[in-house]
Design a protein with these regions (language model features):
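Low-complexity, S/T/G/P-rich flexible repeat/linker segments used as non-globular hinges
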Residues: 88-129, 137-144, 525-543
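MIDAS-like acidic motif and immediate structural context at the N-terminus
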Residues: 6-9, 13, 110-135, 332-340
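Von Willebrand factor A/integrin I-like adhesion domains
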Residues: 52-60, 471-543
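Alpha-helical assembly-interface signal, strongest on the long, hydrophobic N-terminal helix that forms
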Residues: 1-46, 124, 511
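An active-site-proximal "capping" alpha-helix that borders the catalytic cofactor pocket
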Residues: 28-31, 134-154, 162
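Structural recognition of the beta-strand scaffold that forms the well-ordered cores
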Residues: 25-26, 115-120, 157-161, 330-333, ...
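Acidic, Ser/Thr/Gly/Pro-rich low-complexity segments that form flexible
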Residues: 173-260, 264-493
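Extended low-complexity, polyampholyte segments enriched in Ser/Thr/Pro and acidic residues
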Residues: 41-108
Length: 543
């Protein structure tokens, strides 16, 4: 009987032990969860101690509590390890006067994923008043601030430089079906309705990963120089072309490499007009989950790497769904101007074969003379030969011509080759063609004559009046992209950098709130980008 009583007493001590250990463990669990909350304003160790005291337990010592924070409070980890001696009632008779009741708990809270599109104006006016000079260090510090405040692998930044157009480069353009593609430059044209959606339709089937040729076709912007005067034959490879050929101006998409991003910003120069709507469209599109197949393909190809050269396979889910509760999507849009002019070729001179033929004779290698060309006129059924200013039945290079004093007929040099419209615009500026090809063939000697005859119906279309509306359409669409009860609202920060009133009004209306619009000048642009980085980090902490 005494032995049975002793065993019952031991069982009672063990029950008391387990009850006390459970109380300790539950209190420790609740304490670290509360202390690790990133919204918690009370000092971490004070929170833990308070939970124990209110639970009727001794407060842990400072040495029993470990609190760690990220440099920008982007993460917090709290650990507590305690032990309490429980006096025994019956086990003492067997030489066990007390039982240690340990409890340990760890809790961690970390900020989720961040996706940023940095949309920067690099139009010609950015060369004025040292704006581009001031922008570069400011934007690079923003890059550093963001990478310093976000865990490795959780931040991606796309940079979208814009002027008259936005060049997306040969790699990115391959993910879109085009109605008339060429390899001279890489810009897309959009319809007004495209600014009422954040997405673009890629040619990658989201299920199979194969190329989908039935997907929507986009119109590729023509390769042409509409800026140069009629005396300029060769298009400027950078400053004259509507869509630049400078590969250093292509969109840098989905980068997790701060060194790559900063070097890219350093390479900028300024030229061209201003198309805020196109910049914002691409900034929003690069944050839309429709781009996810492109990111997956870039990871598979090994082209998405961090500064150490490691492939960023963790980017595989980007861009995240707008409803994702852990992802924050941000556009930072900077311009020093207002929407001005965008050019598009008229359909008749945008693609397909032109009426212009050229002799491929080596005589004309490097030549800028009209003598190498002939122009077909469908209504006459003849070619105008610029070599001798006559009409005849064969293109220059396919017939013969008469020379005097011998008055003999000689074969034309070379063979005639019909040029596509894109080949024409790669060779000559729009105004040179209008004056020295169209104007000369039809006897239009004055500037007014050849310009009014050819330009209105055939050359370029300007888009000025609707660009502000398109900008506000895409801004509104992006800000309201997540209309669910879940996830985070996409955010837009805008900077008017010494901009005129028209630009200020558009940028202010585009921003997510009045406090997310900044009016900057001179070197204060640096403080503006610092403030935006700080605001983004606060947004990450308050969701």
């Amino acid at each position: 009987f005494i032995m049975m009583l002793g065993l019952a007493g031991v069982a009672l001590d063990l029950m008391r032990y387990e009850e006390r250990r459970t109380v300790l463990q539950n209190t420790a669990d609740r304490a670290v969860l509360a202390a690790a909350d990133l919204n918690q304003t009370i000092p971490c160790k004070d929170v833990v101690k308070d939970y124990f005291v209110k639970g009727g337990l001794p407060a842990p010592s400072d040495s029993q509590i470990n609190c760690q924070n990220g440099a920008f409070d982007e993460w917090r980890e709290v650990t507590v390890a305690v032990s309490e001696d429980l006096p025994t009632w019956f086990m003492n008779m067997y030489g066990i006067p007390k039982l240690a009741t340990p409890a340990a708990a760890t809790a961690e809270e970390r900020i989720g994923q961040v996706e940023i599109s940095l949309v920067l104006d690099v139009s010609g006016s950015m060369d004025s008043n040292s704006r581009l000079i001031n922008l570069k260090p400011a934007a690079k510090k923003f890059i550093d601030d963001m990478f310093d405040s976000v865990e490795e692998g959780k931040l991606s930044i796309s940079i979208v430089p814009f002027n008259t157009q936005v060049s997306i480069g040969p790699d990115l353009i391959d993910y879109f079906n085009l109605d008339a593609d060429h390899d001279f430059s890489y810009c897309l044209e959009f319809d007004p309705n495209d600014f009422k959606t954040t997405s673009l339709t890629t040619n990658i089937d989201p299920v199979t990963g194969n190329v989908d040729l039935a997907a929507r076709k986009y119109k590729q912007n023509g390769h042409f120089d509409a800026f140069a005067g009629s005396s300029t034959y060769t298009p400027s490879p950078d400053f004259g072309l509507n869509c630049t050929q400078d590969r250093g101006r292509d969109i840098l998409a989905f980068s997790g490499n701060r060194d790559q991003l900063k070097a890219y910003i350093d390479s900028f120069d300024a030229y061209g007009y201003t198309s805020i709507d196109l910049g914002m469209k691409w900034g929003a599109a690069l944050l839309d989950p429709a781009m996810a197949p492109i990111v997956d393909d870039m990871i598979a190809a090994g082209t998405l790497k961090d500064s150490s050269g490691k492939v960023l396979s963790e980017f595989g889910d980007r861009p995240y769904q707008f409803s994702n509760q852990e992802a924050l999507k941000v556009v930072v849009l900077m311009s020093d101007g207002a929407n001005t002019t965008e050019y598009e070729l008229q359909p008749d001179v945008d693609s397909g074969l032109s009426p212009l033929w050229r002799s491929n004779s080596t005589t004309y290698n490097g030549s800028t003379s009209a003598a190498q060309y002939s122009l077909w006129d469908q209504s006459r059924g003849q070619y105008y030969i610029f070599y001798n200013n006559t009409w005849r039945n064969e293109a220059w290079g396919d017939g013969t011509y008469k020379t005097c004093g011998t008055c003999a007929f000689k074969p034309d040099p070379g063979d005639a080759v019909q040029l596509s419209w894109q080949e024409v615009w790669d060779r000559m500026t729009v105004n040179w063609y209008a004056r020295y090809i169209h104007g000369r063939a039809y006897g239009l000697a004055t500037t007014n004559a050849w310009s009014s005859s050819w330009s209105p119906s055939n050359s370029v279309v300007k888009h000025e009046t609707n660009k502000d509306a398109q900008t506000l359409d895409i801004c509104t669409t992006f800000k309201s992209a997540n209309n669910t009860l879940y996830g985070r609202r996409p955010q837009i920060y805008t900077i008017a950098f010494e901009a005129p009133n028209a630009g200020i009004n558009v940028l202010r209306s585009c921003a997510s709130s009045t406090t997310q619009f900044y009016n900057a000048s001179g070197s204060t642009i640096g403080g503006t980008f610092t403030a935006i980085a700080s605001s983004i980090n606060k947004l990450r902490l308050t969701y």
